[in-house]
């Protein structure tokens, strides 16, 4: 009996890896045009990082984290998201002390959540995210959203819907909190046990409940927008005005709260409206978190960010019939005939590779016909044939596979010849 993959995980095979590499490369290059730099953090962190950062009333902390004790008895957790770890690193390394602010970072890597596996939702998934720390400007919020939209456009995604909301500052959220408690408390027994627990700890989480989303009280719950103080209203208005200037369309949804406790002021989600995308339409989520750095022992520092699952982006690209990249084909395949040519084959192959030419050869002792079939299977642009006669003359027969044209080239000139042909698109 063969050993199978753990449930909720996947192997990314070579034919698919090109798509992943393409999305990551486009996202990285776009981030760098916006002056964001890469950061890498460990795959596991102290559990406290997530219970304090993400919020102990969230589904992620209560139900979805992969937590274990190491041999020293320390509680560690495979990261379920990227923001808390990035902020922890920001504080540990005192990046807030740099005169170059805001600090703009991007990251990519595997995350882990114990969820029911389905299309676009895995227990191990790859996330790409950005964080901008050190500025409380709504224009920075708009820049982060512009960056997200730019990545999507470069990937060919056009069927998009940006949904935004304001969660306000601490004063606004406290007023909204009290209104939510008053609204839900008389009928809280009709809600699930999670909502009952959240009522006093964080009633905003009730609005994010999947079990009770159809309860009549959900539709009539107090809107956060009615409890924003003057400062929070002005902040949200400035964000909307900047998005208008950037020609970024959006929809305001006062029920959008996001599933993490650290958000305040701006919260947003990017949805796919592509037909056939599936039940889970959320492509990306994010928002502002002005208290998280302080929660981790740093100075009061504002921040904003977003993250998306690469798996979901792939689904969206397929739903929109985007031309997906394929693995790069070979530039050249070396066919050797005879013992001496076979002996010298690795040397010739290495010269080509040293010259930046994607090249390969047979390692199974195949006959010439089978080697030529292999060159065709690998979609090599050129086949280089070397036999005993070619070795004696220090020449190689170069065949252009698309046209069948054959050229005799000195072995010493082979690398430069192929470089010129490839550059010229011949």
Swiss-Prot record:
Enzyme class: ligase
CDD domains, sorted: HisRS-like_core, HisRS_anticodon
UniProt-listed GO biological process terms: histidyl-tRNA aminoacylation
Sample GO molecular function, one term: catalytic activity, acting on a protein
A Pfam short name: HGTP_anticodon
HAMAP family: His_tRNA_synth
Family named by the database record: Belongs to the class-II aminoacyl-tRNA synthetase family.
Protein name per Swiss-Prot or TrEMBL: Histidine--tRNA ligase 1
């Amino acid at each position: 009996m063969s050993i199978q993959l753990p449930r909720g995980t996947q192997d990314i095979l070579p034919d698919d890896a090109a798509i992943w590499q393409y999305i990551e490369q486009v996202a990285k290059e776009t981030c760098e045009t916006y002056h964001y730099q890469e950061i890498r953090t460990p795959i596991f962190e102290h559990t406290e990082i997530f219970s304090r950062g993400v919020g102990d009333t969230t589904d992620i902390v209560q139900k979805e984290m992969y937590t274990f004790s190491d041999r020293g008895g320390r509680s560690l957790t495979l990261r379920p998201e990227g923001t808390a770890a990035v902020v922890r690193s920001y504080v540990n390394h005192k990046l807030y002390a740099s005169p170059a602010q805001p600090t703009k970072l991007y990251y990519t890597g595997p995350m882990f959540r114990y969820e029911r596996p389905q299309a676009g939702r895995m227990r191990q998934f790859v996330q790409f995210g950005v964080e901008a720390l050190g500025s409380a400007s709504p224009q920075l919020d708009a820049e982060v959203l512009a960056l997200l939209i730019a990545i999507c456009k470069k990937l060919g995604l056009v069927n998009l819907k940006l949904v935004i909301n304001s969660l306000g500052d601490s004063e606004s959220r406290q007023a909204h909190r009290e209104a939510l408690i008053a609204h839900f408390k008389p009928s809280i027994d009709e809600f699930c046990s999670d909502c009952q627990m959240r009522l006093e700890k964080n009633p905003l989480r009730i609005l994010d409940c999947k079990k009770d989303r159809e309860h009549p009280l959900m539709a009539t719950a107090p809107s956060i927008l009615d409890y924003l103080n003057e400062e929070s209203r002005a902040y949200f208005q400035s964000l909307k005005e900047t998005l208008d200037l950037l020609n970024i369309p959006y929809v305001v949804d006062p029920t959008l709260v996001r599933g993490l406790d650290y958000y305040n002021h701006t919260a947003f989600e990017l949805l796919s409206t592509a037909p056939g995308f599936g039940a889970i339409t959320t492509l990306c989520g994010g928002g502002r978190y002005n208290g998280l750095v302080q929660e981790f022992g740093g100075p009061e520092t504002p921040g904003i960010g977003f993250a998306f699952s690469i798996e979901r982006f792939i689904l969206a690209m397929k739903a929109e019939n985007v031309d997906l990249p394929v693995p790069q084909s070979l530039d050249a395949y070396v066919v050797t005939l005879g013992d001496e040519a076979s002996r010298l084959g690795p040397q010739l192959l290495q010269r080509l590779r040293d010259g930046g030419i994607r090249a390969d050869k047979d390692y199974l002792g195949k006959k010439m016909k089978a080697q030529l079939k292999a060159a065709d299977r690998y979609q090599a642009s050129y086949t280089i044939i070397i036999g005993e006669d070619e070795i004696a003359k220090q020449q190689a027969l170069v065949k252009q596979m698309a046209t069948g044209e054959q050229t005799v080239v000195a072995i010493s000139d082979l690398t430069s010849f192929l470089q010129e042909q490839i550059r010229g698109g011949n």
